[in-house]
Every structure is written in structure tokens, then in C-alpha cells.
Curated annotation (Swiss-Prot):
InterPro entries: Ig-like_dom, Ig-like_dom_sf, Ig-like_fold, Ig_sub, Ig_V-set, IgV_Light_Chain. Disulfide bonds join 43-109. The lineage of its organism: Eukaryota, Metazoa, Chordata, Craniata, Vertebrata. The keyword Cell membrane applies. Residues 1-20 form the signal peptide. Residues 71-77 are annotated as: Complementarity-determining-2. The gene is IGKV3D-20. This is Immunoglobulin kappa variable 3D-20.
Length: 116
């Protein structure tokens, strides 16, 4: 039986917006999952965010963040279709349908004012 691996997840990320600070709270803080399982990561905003301005990133140690999803649900170039984004308003979700070993990383949601 495989030993569960840790999928790290940042709790809080805030970025200023023209309408004031929007606080993004991610949950859960960590997920203990194994390859082949499904991961669901949530991002809640303190005020409504246009779906056109919500992105998800993956970051591995020593590397720059990699854009996965933009406009809440659009996959960036080269991102496998096991990654999907959904949501609107104040509640957004990143789903990884079947975890691969290379998916174990830190994930961030970001509200932005124009294309990421």
C-alpha cells in the first residue's frame, strides 16, 4: 500500500484591488493524499471577484510559480486536463482529478486586475 504524500496548500494570500483589499482564504491547509486520488482545493474571497480575474498557480521548491488556471476556469497552455477550475463570486475551486506524483506541490489562488 502506498504511503500518503503531503499536498501542501497555502492558507492565506491577499492582494490589493482597486476597490480595496480582497482577502483570499484557501482551504484546507494541507491534504494527505496518494497518487491516483482526487484533490479539491478551495479559495474564498472576502468580496465578490470577477471570474475573469481569478487564477491558480502551482509552485515547487526552488522554482517560480506556474500558472495553471486563469479566468477561474481556463487552463493555461500546456496544463493537463486533469486540472480544472470552477466557481464565481466569492467561492472558487481547483480540482485535480487524478493526482500524479509531480502534482504534489504548493497551490495558490490569486485575484488579479488584468491578464496574469
Amino acid at each position: 500500500m502506498e504511503t500518503p504524500a503531503q499536498l501542501l496548500f497555502l492558507l492565506l494570500l491577499w492582494l490589493p484591488d482597486t476597490t480595496g483589499e480582497i482577502v483570499l482564504t484557501q482551504s484546507p491547509a494541507t491534504l494527505s493524499l496518494s497518487p491516483g486520488e482526487r484533490a479539491t482545493l478551495s479559495c474564498g474571497a472576502s468580496q465578490s471577484v470577477s471570474s475573469s480575474y481569478l487564477a491558480w498557480y502551482q509552485q515547487k521548491p526552488g522554482l517560480a510559480p506556474r500558472l495553471l488556471i486563469y479566468d477561474a476556469s481556463s487552463r493555461a497552455t500546456g496544463i493537463p486536463d486533469r486540472f480544472s477550475g470552477s466557481g464565481s463570486g466569492t467561492d472558487f475551486t481547483l480540482t485535480i482529478s487524478r493526482l500524479e506524483p509531480e502534482d504534489f506541490a504548493v497551490y495558490y489562488c490569486q485575484q488579479y486586475g488584468s491578464s496574469p
